[in-house]
């Protein structure tokens, strides 16, 4: 073994198929400065899908079905994040409060059936002004691994329901209102990651003016709050045909050291992990080489695996 370096091989117990060789400097060499703190044994690169739904809401299938697809596609970890119940009303696409026990049971069942795949317990929660107490109540009900925060409503206006809804709107004004709510969601510190950041582009209604400063202002709020944002492949399956968020948005996020999660926003099991090769390439092009992993609301950063 040379005096300047030696090779150590790290094997992840949770992703046995992945093996990585890391070069470690000699004891006399200066320690490198890491952009993000890394924990031992997490030099192993991973692909993690933290956004998927079930038949309890507006999806199909159950967590076991999502897990089966994830294994087929070579994912290293997944998280179920069905739509959480709203505090004061029921809809066709949110769980009822009485569904929570069933949902948690389904996730536990998937964990038992697929022990080789880490499956995390999460929720996607709509941020609505005044929801804070309800989200805190939800947090105390079960040992959640993470919460995704989303903005689907601007007042009573549904952000992602139809192009017809947008056709009569002042688009720039609606985008500004959306990001005002998005900043509030970040500053609430109720969420671990914010899903599909530029959701208003879904139907290709985009601002006519330069929104760089709006994006930067929103992302500063995220950075100050210590929240992650999601890189979502769902937009590739929508009229916008684009990953959420846009490249300029994600580059600003990287400059501000905002961490990321990956998500497919799968509403059918077949979409779990869809286009994750493109997502990984896109994230790397914007400067990212790490993604978030959550356990019991605690975050760590792991290397982003290339596909």
Predicted regions: what they are:
Residues 5, 12-16, 25:
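Short terminal hydrophobic/aromatic SLiMs and anchors at protein ends
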Residues 7, 11, 19, 31-40:
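Compositionally biased, intrinsically disordered low-complexity segments enriched in Pro/Arg/Gln/His
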Residues 78-80, 147, 194, 229, ...:
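Hydrophobic residues within beta-strands of alpha/beta enzymes
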Residues 83, 197, 258-273, 293:
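Short acidic/histidine-rich active-site segments
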